[in-house]
Amino acid sequence: MVILVGGTNGLMALKVAKISGLPLCYSHVDRYPDGEKYFRFASNIDGEDVVIFNSMHPNPDEIIFETLLIAETAYSNGARSVTCVFPYFAYARSLDTVKGEALPIKTVVKVLKAAGVKKIITVDFHLQENVFGVEHVDLTGMEKLAEYCLEEFSDSFTVLAPDEKAAFWAEKFAAKANCDVVALRKIRIDAENVIIDDLRTGVEGDVVIVDDIVSTGGTVCQAARIAKRAGARRVFVACTHAILARDAMMRILESGIEDIVSTDTILSPVSHVSVADVIASALS
């Protein structure tokens, strides 16, 4: 088995290779003057199980195409199998659509299967189910995030899930931290705006808002204000994937949130927790 580093989050791929002891597969990636992508394996992969390592942020469309190009080329050069590690997997917002609306995850799944991908490894996949039609291993960063929060934020807190879906991850986090969980109910208005119901019970002491993704920050900011109104002393945020789109970081800090931490599935200023060892264990 060899690891091929894609166009994003090469640092984590290098960590995984070092921890697992798996060799790196070298390649040459370039771009023609007209914008077309060039790819070539610089290592012999004949008979190898190739692990393509790519995180789908930023520019998920670019990463998806690059992954397809690499997978196809791997088989053309004698690879025995192709596994894709996507620490962050984009286009997984929902399986629900209205008439005339695209369902991108369906298209992404089709093209990955067509390219011969045999196994997909993700971390805290948003849809919480296997939609790929191939072997899917979904890992979690919640236990490591809980450990970090206990050491760096507070030794006692209540976990707050900002919506019903986030309760799935909040429960994992709370199990490790040995603390209570409270879940809010959210109604999404559009891509950036949500309405969240108030807490029906008060909270005391510190609160950690737990979710898989923080993108614009709208959800966690509203949840933080609700927690404060309910009696929280300090509010922190822990997430697996910190996209932090546009002015999200400023919005979060201005909302009264003390601090935010994420894993390194997406590199950001708050990526203080590494899940490289979790991924390395899944590859061993």
From Swiss-Prot:
It comes from the Archaea. GO terms for molecular function: ATP binding; kinase activity; magnesium ion binding; ribose phosphate diphosphokinase activity. Mg(2+) 2 binds at D163. D-ribose 5-phosphate binds at R188, D211, S215, T216, G217, G218, T219. This is Ribose-phosphate pyrophosphokinase 1. One of its GO terms (cellular component) is cytoplasm. NCBIfam families: ribP_PPkin. It comes from Archaeoglobus fulgidus (strain ATCC 49558 / DSM 4304 / JCM 9628 / NBRC 100126 / VC-16). HAMAP family: RibP_PPkinase_A (MF_00583_A). It holds the Pfam family Pribosyl_synth. It catalyses: D-ribose 5-phosphate + ATP = 5-phospho-alpha-D-ribose 1-diphosphate + AMP + H(+). Mg(2+) 1 binds at H126. The keyword Transferase applies.
